[in-house]
Design a protein with these regions (language model features):
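Surface-exposed loop-to-helix/strand elements on domain peripheries
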Residues: 219-234, 256-301
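Structured, contiguous alpha/beta core segments that scaffold functional sites
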Residues: 1-57, 61-261
């Protein structure tokens, strides 16, 4: 008796794994996730979610307002001009941006040879990590790398700087500002932390729709391979690999389903999986994600 049962294999793509928030103690410093990756996750959510980015940008602009002002309105006074020379409006705005996006900020404090304040420069917080705290729980230094994912490569080696108040002479120091978070010794989470899954969801929905449209409004494809059920696992794996190489570029559909069929004289076929109601399926979730993002940011009115 002929066996016409099918061996089905599902190929999935573009699964994103959220980085684990974990403190890694290595060589005297602490990283916020593997290779300091949690900051990258926050950055991706910021740029990937339309609603989340709009709310963050609004808060940043509200916090900055018109910037710092001279209390007597004398913007030409020597003291005010000296202050702006030390701490520019651009650095002020960047520090506020880091504080909103990352929940903390860092600045490079540069003294003169006479130990007076010379310059306050913004340092992107994603590039600055604390040293391991001493026995009293004090963080006496910070480490800087242009890219922590490349910390072992030449030009990206971490450099240690004293924390503000711990430098000797005219050493450049680093100041990190962050609010108190329960259970957090080294890092402070942004105040919108519960928003992140919904921000990620908005990004994935946008990517889904884009790929859905580029793929001719198809959810994916079924590749029917006739007279292939008797193939060995090695032969099926080899065929599956070829299909992946040919059909699964970044602009293709979500999934490819390979069907290894029984005896059949028909040629191999590719069937498109259609869904005329795909846009309706995501309407509720899209609205819900937007509402949860606004709620998480306390921007409900």
């Amino acid at each position: 008796m002929q066996n016409n049962s099918r061996d089905l294999r599902l190929i999935s793509f573009n699964k994103y794994v959220r980085p684990e928030i974990k403190e890694y103690k290595h060589k005297g410093y602490v990283l916020n996730g593997v290779n300091n990756s949690f900051y990258n996750y926050l950055t991706e959510c910021y740029y990937g979610s339309t609603t989340h980015k709009a709310v963050c940008d609004t808060y940043i602009n509200l916090i900055y307002g018109q910037g710092l002002v001279e209390k007597d309105g004398d913007v030409e006074s020597a003291e005010w001009l000296t202050f702006l020379e030390i701490f520019s409006e651009e650095d002020q705005h960047r520090i506020i941006s880091d504080f909103k996006i990352y929940g903390e900020f860092s600045a490079q404090v540069i003294p003169t040879r006479g130990k007076t304040l010379s310059k306050i420069l913004h340092l992107e917080k994603s590039k600055v990590v604390p040293s391991v705290a001493d026995d009293l729980g004090n963080i006496t230094s910070y480490w800087y790398s242009k890219d922590w994912s490349k910390q072992w490569q030449q030009g990206y080696e971490p450099v240690e700087y004293p924390a503000m108040g711990h430098g000797k002479g005219n050493e450049t120091e680093i100041y990190v500002g962050k609010p108190y978070n329960v259970g957090k010794e080294y890092f402070s989470d942004p105040d919108y932390l519960p928003v992140l899954p919904y921000a990620e969801f908005e990004q994935e929905v946008a990517n889904y729709y884009l790929k859905y449209i580029k793929n001719g409004l198809s959810l994916g494809n079924i590749v029917n391979v006739p007279n292939s059920q008797h193939w060995s696992s090695e032969e099926k794996d080899k065929y599956e690999k070829k299909v992946k190489e040919r059909l699964t570029g970044s602009d293709n559909a979500n999934q490819v389903l390979i069907s290894f069929n029984g005896a059949d004289t028909s040629p191999s076929t590719i069937e498109s999986i259609k869904n005329d109601y795909a846009h309706k399926q995501w309407d509720f979730l899209t609205v819900e994600a937007r509402q949860q993002i606004l709620t998480g940011h306390k921007a409900t009115s």
